[in-house]
C-alpha cells in the first residue's frame, strides 16, 4: 500500500490583494470575496507571479496593491474556476484551500500589468456580471 501524498505544487506560492498584512499573519476563508458580494468558503492563491498580480490589481479596494509569499497550512486543490476552462489543466497554477495560508514575506517590488490590460480585464468582468455569468464556484 502506498500512503505517499500527491503534492499538486511545491510553490513558492503567492497571494495578490490590497490588504495590508503582517508577516506571520494567517489568511483564512470566510472573508468577503473580492469578486462577489458574499463571504468566500476558500482562500485563493497561485504559484505564478502573473496570476498574483491580477489578484492584487483586481481586488475590490482603493488601497495599495500587494503580493505576499504564502505557505499553505493544509490541503489545497486546483481552483475549479480556472482549471480546464480556457486552457487544459491549470497553467496559471491557481489553487484554493479551506485551511489558512501563512504570510511569510511581501514582495517589495513587482511590475504591474499595463493600465490598458487592467481596464480591459475590469470591463470583461463587468460584462460577465451583467450577463449573470460571473459566478464563482466556491
Kindly label every feature range from the protein language model.
Residues 49-63:
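Short active-site loop/helix that positions an aromatic residue
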Residues 2, 56-57, 106-111:
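Short amphipathic beta-strand and strand-loop transition segments with alternating hydrophobic
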Amino acid at each position: 500500500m502506498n500512503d505517499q501524498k500527491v503534492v499538486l505544487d511545491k510553490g513558492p506560492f503567492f497571494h495578490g490583494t490590497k490588504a495590508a498584512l503582517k508577516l506571520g499573519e494567517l489568511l483564512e476563508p470566510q472573508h468577503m470575496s473580492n469578486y462577489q458580494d458574499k463571504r468566500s468558503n476558500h482562500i485563493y492563491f497561485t504559484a505564478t507571479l502573473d496570476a498574483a498580480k491580477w489578484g492584487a490589481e483586481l481586488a475590490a479596494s482603493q488601497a495599495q496593491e500587494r503580493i505576499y509569499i504564502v505557505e499553505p497550512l493544509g490541503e489545497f486543490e486546483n481552483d475549479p474556476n480556472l482549471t480546464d476552462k480556457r486552457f487544459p489543466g491549470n497553467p496559471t497554477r491557481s489553487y484554493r484551500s479551506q485551511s489558512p495560508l501563512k504570510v511569510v514575506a511581501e514582495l517589495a517590488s513587482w511590475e504591474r500589468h499595463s493600465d490598458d490590460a487592467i481596464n480591459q480585464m475590469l470591463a470583461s468582468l463587468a460584462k460577465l456580471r451583467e450577463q449573470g455569468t460571473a459566478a464563482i464556484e466556491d
